[in-house]
Regions:
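Membrane-helix interface/capping residues of multi-pass secondary transporters
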Residues: 42, 77, 206-209, 279
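A late C-terminal transmembrane helix in Major Facilitator Superfamily
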Residues: 244, 248-257, 266, 274-307
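Cytoplasm-facing ends of alpha-helical transmembrane segments in multi-pass membrane proteins
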Residues: 23-40, 90-102, 261-271
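Glycine-rich segments within core transmembrane alpha-helices of 12-TM secondary carriers
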Residues: 22, 26, 41-91, 182-193, ...
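Membrane-interfacial loop- and helix-cap regions that link adjacent transmembrane helices
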Residues: 1-18, 97-98, 102-265, 269, ...
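Interfacial helix-cap and linker-helix signal at transmembrane-aqueous boundaries
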Residues: 66-72, 165-166, 202-203, 304-308
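Loop-to-transmembrane helix entry/capping segments in MFS-fold secondary transporters
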Residues: 13, 31-32, 36-52, 178, ...
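Extracellular/lumenal N-termini and interhelical loops of multi-pass eukaryotic membrane proteins
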Residues: 311-316
Length: 316
């Protein structure tokens, strides 16, 4: 490992540039994957979301075991790097293996035939052969909003607020050292994985009414703030109304399950809102809404410490 204590400024900018490059590449990759999955039956779009939640669960487990087994942070970092390298190689292999898959080639062939037929029809009628992006956006907008709002609420709470909630009972079954790791990261990622798995079996409610439970999820924001949320270097003014660790655990579980479930369902509904030849474009719009929801949710989470430091409801 390199000692960067002698050049902190250069290290900072190298880190920032690396983060920008990595996240830009991740955004392009994620958008492309959702576009590819949108050409397949809806359950495959749900499988992409499920895979994202599975990676979160795997990371949370890795964090827990490295914290438990690694003697120091440097050793834990080596474990993380080696694991990430193997997973990256596996993903690289599957990327090149996908076109060999017979089912994917069959679905791609159907999509190409539909596109060729549309091109011939447009050529005969003199229409421009470009996707009607605005029309696709308007048709998908209800599900785009659902996707955005699910991730907005989730990322407004996880991990910034979620990880700063402290135990209210010193004798709780999970010790203070592992409290945030288990109650926040492991609980959320595992329950989100369960929610995504349920969505692959059952999609409810319908496209028209999905917005109702999605909007109701905004109530998780005050519920989490009412728990024993103690942001660092902030004097909390808002009273702690939920001081039972088991109640907090139930709230965290339902938040995680609903996040995984409704995000999967909304992403699965999105390509169904348009004609089959536009499903890939609709999937990419859905991925853009997902990323936008994540970004705005993270930005909004920065307001939470100020809320508990300046707002006192005065409820008895």
């Amino acid at each position: 490992m390199t000692d960067s204590s002698g050049w902190p400024g250069a290290f900072f900018w190298i880190t920032m540039v690396s983060v920008v490059i990595l996240n830009t590449a991740n955004g392009i990759y994620q958008n492309s994957v959702f576009g590819m999955a949108a050409k397949l039956p809806p359950k495959y779009t749900g499988a992409v979301v499920l895979g994202a939640n599975l990676s979160g669960t795997f990371t949370a487990l890795l964090s827990f075991f490295s914290e438990y087994m690694a003697p120091n942070i440097r050793t834990a970092a080596i474990y993380y790097f080696i694991t990430a390298l193997f997973i990256l190689l596996a993903c690289f292999d599957t990327y090149f293996a996908l076109p060999i898959n017979r089912f994917y080639r069959y679905s791609e062939l159907l999509h190409q035939k539909a596109a060729s037929k549309r091109q011939l029809e447009n050529k005969a009628t003199g229409k421009q052969d470009t996707p009607p992006y605005w029309k696709i956006f308007r048709q998908c907008f209800p599900q785009l909003f659902n996707t955005f709002f699910v991730f907005f609420v989730t990322l407004a709470l996880f991990p910034n607020v979620h990880s700063d909630i402290q135990s209210s009972d010193p004798h709780f079954v999970i010790s203070g050292k592992y409290y945030a790791t288990v109650m926040c990261f492991l609980t959320f990622n595992t329950t989100a994985l369960i929610g995504s798995s349920i969505a692959s079996l059952v999609q409810w409610p319908s496209k028209k009414y999905l917005v109702i439970p999605v909007v109701w999820r905004v109530l998780y924001i005050p519920l989490f703030l009412f728990c024993n949320y103690q942001p660092k270097d902030i004097a909390r003014v808002l009273p702690v109304y939920i001081n039972n660790d088991w109640v907090y655990f139930v709230i965290a579980v339902t938040m995680g399950v609903s996040s995984g479930y409704f995000s999967s369902v909304s992403m699965m509904y999105c390509p169904r809102m348009v004609e089959s030849q536009h499903s890939a474009t609709a999937g990419m719009f859905g991925a853009a809404s997902l990323i936008t929801g994540i970004f705005t949710g993270i930005m909004f989470s920065m307001v939470m410490p100020s809320l508990v430091a300046n707002v006192s409801l005065g409820l008895s």
